[in-house]
Amino acid sequence: MNKNIEQFPRKTTLTPQQKLEQLMEQHKTVHLTELFDKEQDRFAKYCVGCEDLVFDFSKQRINQPILDALVQLAESKQLNKWIDTLFSQNKINYTEQREAMHWALRLPADNQVYPELAKQVSDQLERMYQLVNKIHEGQYRGATGEVIQDVVNIGVGGSDLGPLMVSHALSDFKVKTAKPLNIRFVSTMDGSQLSDILHQLRPETTLFIVSSKSFSTIDTLSNAHTARKWLEKALGRESSILKSHFIGVSTKPDKMTEWGIHPDNQFLLWDWVGGRYSLWSCIGLPIALTIGVEGFKAFLAGAHGIDEHFRTTEFHQNIPVLMGLMGIWNTNYLNLKTHAVLPYDGRLKYFTSYLQQLEMESNGKSTQRNGQKVENTTCPIVWGEVGPNAQHAFYQLLHQGTQKVSCDFIAPMHRYNANHFTYVENADALIDQHLLALSNCLAQSRLLAFGNDALKVDQREQLPAYKQYEGNQPSTTMLLKELSPRTMGKLIALYEHKVFVQSVIWDINPFDQWGVEKGKEIANDLLPILNGESSDLSHLDDSTQGLIQFLLGKSNG
C-alpha cells in the first residue's frame, strides 16, 4: 500500500456541551431580527400548545440546531431516567434521604399505580374538604357560639407564599358562603402584619390556621403565640378556646398537640413534601376556603395534567423541558444573569414572589450530587412585577440599559366574560381594559426582541441615540385560555418541572435548602444578647459587635 496516500482527518464527535459552545460562538451576535428573517415560520416551529395554554418561545435566541443540541444535552444528562425517578418513591432528595413526591398530592383518588399513596393523600384532603364545607355553610362556630367569619393563615415560605399567591390569583372564583368570609395572611416575624390585622378582627369570629411543616419555625410560632395571647385575653384560657379557634397543618402531630391544637383540628402532610411544593396539600386550606372544594379539585387536576404531559411527552414538544432548556441556553451560553417574570394580569401580583422561592431556593446551589463544585452557573436571579406596573418602573432598563435579561410574559386570553366575574355590569369597559393589557404584553415582547425594527419605518428615521432600541432581549410568552383553578394548577406545575429539568442539567439537588439553615441558628445565638440574657460578644466580628452596641444603646458613636 502506498504510504504516501493522504489520510483524511478523522471526524471528531462533539459532546452536546461542546456543540452548544460552538453554536454559541457562531450565534452570540446574531440578532432576533435576523433569526426571524431567516425563518419566516418561527411561531409554527417554536410554539407548543397543551389544551388550554400556549407556550411561544419563538422570541428566544435559538434556531433548530441550537434546540436540537439542547435536547441532546438533556438526553446526555439522562433526563428521562431522572423524570422516572421523580415519579417514583425513590429518595431523590439524597441529602435529606427523602422522596420528592409533591406530584402524589394531585393524584386522582382512584389512581391504580400508587393506590396506597393516593388513599393516604385523599384521606387528608377529604378531612380538609369537610372542614371547608362546614365553614362555608356557617356551621363552624367559635368558643362563644358565633359563626367564624375571618380566617388568618399563619405561615412563612411555602406555607405562606403559595396559598397567598393562589388565593389572590383566583379571587374571581371566590365561592359564596352562608356568612361573609375573609381570608388573611400573616408571615413576618416582626409582628407588623399581625398587628395591622388583629385590631380589625373580633376574637369570637376569628379562626387561625398555623401552617408549619416542622412546627418549629420561629417566625410562624411567634405569630401564633401572639394570636393565642390575643384570643385568651378576650375569651379566657379554657381549652375550648384553642380547640375552636386554631387549626394546625404539619408533619408533626405531637408538636401540634403539645402546642395546644386539638387532634380533630390537625391536618397532616409528609416529609416527602417540600415546603415550596406543599400548596397542593392541606397547606392549601386557604385556597380551598377561597375557591371551594370543587375549585380546589380542579386546581389539583390541572397540575396532574401537566405531570402527565411532562412524564410522557417527547422533549421537543414537552413544555417544562423546553422552559428549562431555554433557561439553560440563556444562563450558561448567552451569559444572562437575571430572569424577569412579567404577568399581564393583576391577579398574578404575587406570582413572581412565589417563583423566587420555587426557583432560587431549589436551584440556588453550587454543589453537585457528587459533592464537587458545579461546573456552570446555576439559577439566575428571578425578579419581576405585574407587567403594566413594571412598564413604569424597570422597563427602561430592559429596553435601553446595559443588562441582558430574559423574560417570561404571561397573560390570559379571555377575562370578564364568565359568570364568576364579580362586576358584570361593567364588563364591556373592563373587557376593553383587558385588551389594552394584552396589546401592551405583545408590544413589549416585540420591542424587546426587535428593537428599532419593531418601529414603523418613518419612526426609525433620524432617531437620536437616546431614542434607539437595541432589542435582542429574549423572551417567552405563555397564554392561558383564562386564569382559572385548572389553568393556575397547570401554570404552577409547569414551573415546578422546569426547575427540576434545570437541576438535572446542573446535576444539583433541587429539593433541599441548606443555605437557609445556619442563618437561623446564628440568630438564635444572638437573641440572648439582645434580650439581656447574655453579654458575651467576644466570639463575634467587629461589625456585629458594633451594631449590637448601637442596638443596646451602649455605643459612643
UniProtKB/Swiss-Prot annotation:
Give the catalysed reaction(s), semicolon-separated.
Answer: alpha-D-glucose 6-phosphate = beta-D-fructose 6-phosphate
SUPFAM superfamilies membership: SIS domain
Assign the protein's first listed, main location to one coarse class.
Answer: cytoplasm
Please name the PROSITE patterns in this protein's record: P_GLUCOSE_ISOMERASE_1 (PS00765), P_GLUCOSE_ISOMERASE_2 (PS00174), P_GLUCOSE_ISOMERASE_3 (PS51463)
Identify the metabolic or biological route this protein is part of. Carbohydrate biosynthesis; gluconeogenesis; Carbohydrate degradation; glycolysis; D-glyceraldehyde 3-phosphate and glycerone phosphate from D-glucose: step 2/4
Output a single Gene Ontology CC term carried by this record. Answer: cytosol
Q: Name one GO biological process term.
A: glucose 6-phosphate metabolic process
Keywords assigned by UniProt, alphabetized? Cytoplasm, Gluconeogenesis, Glycolysis, Isomerase
HAMAP family documented for this protein: G6P_isomerase
Task: Specify the protein name.
Answer: Glucose-6-phosphate isomerase
Species this chain originates from: Acinetobacter baylyi (strain ATCC 33305 / BD413 / ADP1)
Could you read off the lineage of the organism from its UniProt record? Bacteria, Pseudomonadati, Pseudomonadota, Gammaproteobacteria, Moraxellales
Q: Which gene encodes it?
A: pgi
